[in-house]
């Protein structure tokens, strides 16, 4: 496509071009010229100009804009220097270019929580519900149908007998579901109440390593029970209040929230009409506090799923920075710091900087994002719990290029950081609402980079230095996740001096060989902490299973002639997942270890995505449950 000389000149000096066909933006302004999106880069370093995205209806309007204004003021400084020299950013400001699209605009919320735990409530009676779904174990459902007086008023006797017969026939070891056509029903206000009733029965028998709530069964039957796109209400029943978290977790992850599919019309009004209404969820038998906590977990799982599903055109390092700062703003009272390439190198975080240096040449700089939440009544000087997440926005493998079709889907390589951001927001929100008690500060570190291939990419045989001051000889640029985590765990242990350090990552394919697609593989330096993590996995539905922790067996895998260690193993048949965790642990501060610091590594490469490739939000429930238990 030919462009005017003016466009070429201006683009060369001031603009960053990115192909993009969508013109909607959460910020309402988009640059689109001949289907080409232009990002204006304003101001010198430290100036009051940052990127802004502007919409032009034609080439002529673009030309007039260029003549009229060579730089675009985009508000306040995106960052300020703190007394320690770190780059600090708040939730309203940005350290890089704005995106033409924000992934949250493509999110359709799936769950909306109702304060009533009854099948029918005054609020619900005002709405049109085509389907009413009940999910639970047989005994819990029988109790609900017997004691909920609103059912007798709204469901006829014939339908109730069909429901009872189905519950009696349900198998103990397997989930099952059915849909009963009831026809149009009207309440006293002549509003349609329900036309179908769906029953989802959860298994009552599970193995000892599984979640006793039967949440895995809910995922199997969720689509058939309540996923038909109709306006619907879902009532979840349980005899154990502790089960609601895992059941809501499972229900949420069954319905992806992100989509960029066209609606078949450019009319926003028609688009709006085609969006399905969210499911209204009621938790029968749950306290108000439990319902609030379940809602927070559901929203956090949706956030993590959306981030994983968003393409790297939007969810690049800057997109992840934007998501983190937006979460901080939603919670309120959260302090934030963001290091980009220059600050990372200045402060000795050589591993994150190295992994992201190729993408940096194209403007996609790596980042270390720090969010700090101090609960009410807790001193900021108290030792925190630290969460460290791997956030590789896209992984090509670098010069150790992924081949044989293994690269598609690598947008999900930031699943650990996404889940930790969701968990951080849920914990902070629950602490503020009083549904979870936090007795110490909570720190989140998102180690973000794009592992790109290019002339600026790190090479095998390069030697880099981590924040711990240890040198690493690269023998596999596709083993980059452990590199970014190395800087994160070192900072969390050495600088933050956390009591407990948890890192989470889609780290190794070997994890799936070891523990499969439903369990994460965990490595821990403390027996009690490991057992607690397994317990919390069962409570939350985010199952976790221990892998060996044995430095004396695994450290030799990283021997190097020229550096403190290599970054990948010599013997790929020697417990690769444990070895990868060992590499991360080698960068945890030695003095912190000697003083009894507790470390947990969660490799969730398998459970982070469904077989379809969509994100599951795995890790949110596990972390919320684990941090809550640590504060009891």
State what each model feature region is.
Residues 9-23, 30-31:
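Intrinsically disordered, low-complexity terminal segments enriched in Ser/Thr
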Residues 17-21, 35-38, 69-70:
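Low-complexity, intrinsically disordered transcriptional activation domains enriched in glutamine
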Residues 86-90, 94-391:
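Short amphipathic alpha-helical segment within the helicase RecA-like ATPase core
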